Amino acid sequence: MNSEILNIPDIHVGNMIIDYLKSHDRTQSYLARVLEMNVANLNKILKKKSMETERLFEISMKLDYNFFAVFGNDLNLTDAGTYKITMPELGLHIERRMRDLRMTQMEFEEKTGIRRSDVNRILKKVSFDTDKLRVISDALNYNFFKDFYSAKDDPMAEQQNEQSNMGMILRLEELAGENRLQKQEIENLKKENLYLKTKLTEAGIEF
């Protein structure tokens, strides 16, 4: 039902890129060269239906073509000069959407097939497989592919970027706090261990 609302196209990403190269009289050898990889490795990547968003972002940048806009049904924002493209903190965006929907990790698992034990790891990721991101988008009724781009000189997009940056800052502060707590726990355990060793030594017990 959600996929009908969003209407995110089910795309073979490799074929989409190959078709683009052909229509613009460019070869796979050219793409391999600008990506600084050998042609054999590129061929393997392009044979696959899906691709990591980080890789698709790189290819979009190198070819000056917004492939994410195809997933977003914004074909008017595919060509150079019509859009701004950014690499969002996808995990943060997904987590924020879950909070907005008040969706539990159990519900997220039911809708996406991602195990609850993996959810926290997923929410810290920056790059996602395009097929997986499509599933997550459908489950949360939000097209996350649109977070990669905006219309050029769109003031609303600038505001969203600022909010995203603030979210990243808050996440970093949260992780720093967790790190400090973990370090303190380790120090406490070391002190406790030293205390126990001292007591055992005083009692004449070898260890």
Range-by-range predicted roles:
Residues 1-24, 76-101:
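A short, Lys/Arg-rich alpha-helix, primarily the initiator
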Residues 64-81, 141-158:
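Short C-terminal boundary/hinge segments that cap the last helix of small helical domains
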Residues 48-61, 125-138:
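Short, basic-rich loop-to-helix N-cap that marks the start of a DNA-contacting helix
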Residues 104, 161-185, 190-192, 197-199, ...:
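Heptad-repeat coiled-coil/leucine-zipper oligomerization helices
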Residues 24-41, 100-120:
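Short alpha-helical DNA-recognition segment
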Residues 1-45, 55, 65-71:
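N-terminal, leucine/charged-rich tether regions that mediate assembly and partner docking
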Residues 12, 53, 57, 79-80, ...:
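Helical coiled-coil/dimerization "stalks"
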